[in-house]
Amino acid sequence: MLYRLVSHIPHILFKPVYDAYESYLLEKVKSGNIPKHVAIIMDGNRRWARKLEKPPWYGHLFGSKKLEEILEWCRELNIRTLTVYAFSTENFKRSKEEVEALMNLFEEKFKELVQDERVHRYGIRVNVLGRKDMLPENVRKAAEEAERATRKYSNYNLNIALAYGGRSEIADAVREIVRDVLEGKIKPEDIDEEAIKRYLYYPNMPDPDIVIRTGGEVRISNFLLYQIAYSELFFVDVYFPEFRKIDFLRIIREFQKRQRRFGR
């Protein structure tokens, strides 16, 4: 009992300082250039669960709760588009038990989004990017219902990359372009960067200003390969469930200090 009390003393002592620094950062960020689109590779859920000697689903559950927090942070800063990498096409190679647990979690969370009054109050549109035909029918239907229920909203966009791969997205786009060329709907000489973008999973999505990867790994992992050519990349050495608002604000602040050249 005494050990538990003592172990919390540093947190109690430093919390006012921490809160003051967070408030300071928030005001600094609000006074600067706010990114329009933030994309996040939500990595480290399983390793976080393993550290706590818990099963993988436990990490994914807490990761989904962290995503809810990040949505609120984005709304507070008026970041209009958030894209998250939830499940890749390669992730289907994981154990049957983990994939099934994840699919059940996705179905549950999509249904919660439809009922969440904050989604409707703030006008958050849900878009699911990926090969939906690879998803179990119950998950696909839940995802499509979340899209239908929020289709009329335009204040904010939550893009969920599910059964997604950047190379798959480009391959699917090329396949559709070839089909339209053969059918005479588009001329080969009209194919340029913007034309290709119109064939991506969500063509109206602005390119990400920032890509954040949690979990300590320094790689892109086949995420939004066409869209992130000029994005600012940030790699954070913290598991996704432990990602803090102060980490998020520091990244936005660093983004504001960078001079983006877009290849010029």
From Swiss-Prot:
GO molecular function: magnesium ion binding; prenyltransferase activity
Residues that coordinate or bind substrate: 44-48, 60, 88-90, 92, 94, 213, 219-221
Entry EC number(s): 2.5.1.89
Catalytic activity: geranylgeranyl diphosphate + 7 isopentenyl diphosphate = tri-trans,hepta-cis-undecaprenyl diphosphate + 7 diphosphate
GO biological-process terms attached to the record: polyprenol biosynthetic process
Enzyme class: transferase
InterPro entries, sorted: UPP_synth-like, UPP_synth-like_CS, UPP_synth-like_sf
CDD domains named in the record: Cis_IPPS
Pfam families: Prenyltransf (PF01255)
Necessary cofactors: Mg(2+)
Transferase recorded as keyword: yes
UniProt keyword list: Magnesium, Metal-binding, Transferase
Domain of life (superkingdom): Archaea
Binding site residues for Mg(2+): D43, E232
Active site residues of this protein: D43, N91 (proton acceptor)
Cofactor comment text: Binds 2 magnesium ions per subunit.
Keyword Cytoplasm part of the UniProt annotation: no
Family: Belongs to the UPP synthase family.
Entry function: Catalyzes the sequential condensation of isopentenyl diphosphate (IPP) with geranylgeranyl diphosphate (GGPP) to yield (2Z,6Z,10Z,14Z,18Z,22Z,26Z,30E,34E,38E)-undecaprenyl diphosphate (tritrans,heptacis-UPP). It is probably the precursor of glycosyl carrier lipids.
Quaternary organization: Homodimer.
Protein name: Tritrans,polycis-undecaprenyl-diphosphate synthase (geranylgeranyl-diphosphate specific)
Species of origin: Thermococcus kodakarensis (strain ATCC BAA-918 / JCM 12380 / KOD1)
